[in-house]
């Protein structure tokens, strides 16, 4: 549908413009790396790029935390809404994946998944697995708090610039790059499926719970 294509296009754009793609500055594994793109730490440029994408793709959630907030603050027994939002999450992953594939074709010196996971073990370059998922209570609480703040920004301002500032400021707490991380993992043999998926779900649920909490508090204050 048009909404799903809009979501995919928005995810493609934000992955390309903001998240970027890491490349080698020289020979692979022998040189430094640099980011082609603005990056989430790009300050005002990142805020501006994200705001422009939100305005250009009006109606798209673009980022997983925004979709999770809508899921958890809507009617929880509305299966149609859950399916629609689930499709949005899927299209965000597809859009991010398409952007990664395109950037890889345009940047032959890009860092591959295996290269990014390679470490020297006894003098031998060894591809390592991602660390196993471990539950962190403070990380969960941080996600809930960030979700509550982000929902207040989203519901009270309805302003892409305000949302962009909130997302960039709290990116590490809300799993802003979750869809691109999922896309990267799925396109690379799914070797780190479990830790990547669990981190993605934890961040989404934490942000969603935070948004629900903020909504309930706001309702009780009226």
Each predicted region: which residue ranges?
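Membrane-interface helix-loop junctions and terminal tails of multi-pass membrane proteins
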Residues: 1-222
């Amino acid at each position: 549908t048009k909404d799903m294509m809009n979501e995919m296009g928005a995810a493609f754009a934000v992955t390309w413009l903001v998240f970027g793609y890491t490349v080698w500055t020289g020979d692979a594994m022998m040189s430094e790396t640099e980011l082609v793109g603005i990056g989430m730490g790009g300050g005002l440029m990142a805020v501006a790029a994200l705001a422009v994408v939100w305005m250009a793709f009006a109606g798209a959630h673009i980022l997983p935390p925004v979709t999770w907030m809508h899921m958890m603050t809507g009617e929880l027994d509305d299966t149609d809404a859950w399916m629609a939002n689930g499709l949005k999450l899927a299209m965000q992953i597809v859009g991010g994946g398409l952007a990664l594939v395109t950037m890889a074709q345009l940047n032959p010196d890009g860092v591959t998944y295996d290269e990014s996971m390679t470490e020297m073990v006894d003098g031998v370059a060894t591809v390592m697995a991602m660390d196993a998922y471990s539950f962190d209570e403070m990380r969960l609480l941080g996600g809930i708090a960030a979700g509550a703040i982000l929902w207040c920004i989203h519901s009270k301002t309805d302003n892409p610039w305000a949302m962009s500032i909130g997302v960039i400021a709290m990116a590490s707490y809300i799993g802003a790059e979750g869809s691109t991380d999922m896309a990267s993992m799925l396109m690379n043999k799914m070797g780190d499926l479990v830790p990547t998926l669990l981190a993605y779900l934890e961040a989404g649920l934490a942000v969603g719970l935070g948004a629900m909490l903020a909504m309930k508090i706001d309702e009780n204050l009226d």
